[in-house]
Amino acid sequence: MARRTRVYKDAVPDARTAIAIGEAVMLPVYGRHQVLSQRPQVAELQGDVWYVHGYQPPISAGGTAEAYIDKHTGRILCITDGGE
């Protein structure tokens, strides 16, 4: 018997999903305190890639945790701290 595969247009259809995935992959890399202290996370769609990043007050040094996620496949393209 052939197995049916359901094809979805976008694995990451909205900002809420992108943020959930972004936080999930950033937590093991940067730690719970670092990631959660940068809430609220923001997700911006840039072409076919979700750019997920945290908030950091303007007077703070360093960068925020960032993740780039393919909208169609959900593949993590890059995780970085966005530091200068």
Task: Please state what every model-predicted region is.
Residues 1-84:
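Long, terminal "pre-/pro-" and other extracytoplasmic accessory regions
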